[in-house]
């Protein structure tokens, strides 16, 4: 919302809802001061959605397990939606929302921010130019980052796949979506392997307290020490997403909060975390394009290699730091390498590689100027397919099967498979 207020001629906030009052007030305070008194605040989504339609577009940014109900009610009230990913906690509900949006003629944009980044748009332009020739295969990697993984997918909201969604959906639906977008064709088959190997009690070589605040050794001696939230600014910034008032809190107040919160736990003794800390998937797309995707807690940043009949493309943080450039194209026979220029993030705002700014700046066009929902940048119709891919990868990981995407979707819709 803060970014949307950079476009006052396009956007106006009329209401906000959150069970934590200060968060709703923060949304209100993003608006120009002269408009704040007219903005209505509600205690929760139910209260807001019990009102007649208040605006053109509703933004739903609740936790993963509470997307479906408010999204469904908002669509039925006549709202177009900007919906945080994943679309819903289950694939069946995801497909139900897709079908409901089509039935009601409503526009639903999904926050797949990678589609809006200068980085991935530059890659897509290279592919569409034909410079690589026909695409044959790709390797894509997402390094979640060690502290990020421990914060979000062990201690945090997404540590348990039943309470949230499977890792490939909760985190990597961004990747499934961007690969679908880059390949520009449907995925037909997937297989996958992945395990929770490291963040479990068996990793410990000797007993220790389950809460880091009960440890007596020097802070930071163990790299996973939650007390680093107090002493290390690079760790503390993650608390801004889960602890209200952290910017004004004293070290003593943060320590007290850690004593009872999920984020004070030892990452090896959380007990309820079940997300794989490493995962690989093999994907086959229409026309025979194949690719691999790797998710790991033990690297940071995304990188990708795409191999065509004329040339190969290499891109990502690894190549920016260790090679000739963030994106390069190398011809197979001449060995000539071209560095692809990547635009700076618009407006100087680099959140999600500039994708946050891109999403907001395109929202008005997508909701009001695009001739049809399918011409939006992230329509639910396209995003739903990437969710099918992600849930199919999870099914393949659990069962060891090679999963046919169309058949998997049919079995989920029929109730034969519970996803």
Identify the residue ranges that each predicted region occupies.
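Glycine-rich beta-alpha junction loops
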Residues: 20, 141-146, 194-199, 287-289, ...
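Predominantly a Rossmann-like dinucleotide-binding segment in NAD(P)-dependent oxidoreductases
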Residues: 114-266, 400
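C-terminal helical cap and adjacent loop that interface with cofactors, partners, or active-site loops
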Residues: 17, 275-419
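N-terminal Rossmann-like dinucleotide-binding module
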Residues: 1-36
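Rossmann-fold dehydrogenase core element
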Residues: 96-113, 133-140
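Short, Asp-centered acidic motifs that coordinate Mg2+ and/or phosphate
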Residues: 15, 56-57, 137
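Beta-loop-alpha module in the N-terminal Rossmann-like domain of NAD(P)-dependent dehydrogenases
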Residues: 37-100
């Amino acid at each position: 919302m803060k970014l949307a207020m950079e476009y006052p001629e396009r956007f106006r906030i009329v209401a906000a809802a959150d069970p934590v009052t200060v968060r709703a007030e923060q949304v209100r305070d993003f608006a120009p001061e002269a408009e704040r008194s007219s903005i209505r605040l509600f205690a929760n989504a139910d209260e807001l959605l019990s009102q007649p339609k208040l605006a053109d577009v509703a933004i739903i940014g609740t936790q993963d397990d509470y997307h479906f109900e408010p999204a469904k009610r908002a669509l039925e009230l006549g709202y177009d939606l900007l919906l945080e990913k994943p679309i819903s906690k289950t694939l069946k509900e995801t497909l139900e929302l897709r079908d409901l949006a089509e039935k009601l003629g409503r526009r639903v944009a999904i926050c797949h921010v990678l589609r809006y980044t200068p980085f991935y748009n530059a890659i897509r332009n290279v592919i569409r130019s034909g410079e690589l020739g026909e695409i044959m295969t790709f390797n894509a990697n997402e390094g979640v980052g060690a502290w990020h993984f421990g914060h979000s997918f062990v201690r945090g909201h997404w540590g348990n796949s039943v309470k949230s969604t499977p890792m490939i959906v909760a985190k990597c639906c961004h990747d499934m979506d961007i690969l679908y977008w880059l390949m520009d064709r449907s995925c037909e088959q997937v297989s996958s392997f992945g395990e929770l190997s490291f963040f479990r009690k068996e990793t410990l070589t000797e007993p220790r307290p389950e809460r880091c605040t009960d440890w007596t050794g020097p802070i930071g001696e163990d790299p996973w020490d939650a007390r680093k939230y107090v002493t290390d600014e690079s760790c503390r910034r993650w608390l801004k997403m889960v602890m209200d008032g952290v910017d004004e809190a004293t070290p003593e107040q943060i320590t007290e909060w850690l004593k009872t919160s999920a984020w004070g736990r030892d990452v090896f003794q959380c007990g309820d975390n079940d997300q794989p800390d490493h995962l690989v998937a093999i994907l086959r797309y229409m026309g025979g394009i194949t690719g691999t995707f790797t998710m790991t807690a033990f690297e940071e940043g995304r990188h990708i290699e795409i191999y065509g009949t004329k040339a190969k493309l290499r891109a990502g943080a690894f190549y920016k730091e260790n090679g000739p450039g963030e994106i390069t194209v190398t011809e197979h026979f001449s060995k000539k390498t071209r560095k692809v220029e990547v635009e700076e993030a618009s407006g100087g705002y680099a959140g999600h590689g500039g994708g946050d700014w891109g999403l907001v700046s395109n929202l008005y066009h997508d909701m009001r100027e695009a001739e049809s929902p399918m011409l939006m940048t992230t329509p639910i119709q396209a995003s739903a397919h990437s969710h099918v891919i992600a849930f199919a990868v999870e099914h393949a990981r659990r069962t060891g099967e090679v999963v046919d995407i169309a058949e998997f979707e049919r079995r989920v819709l029929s109730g034969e498979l519970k996803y």
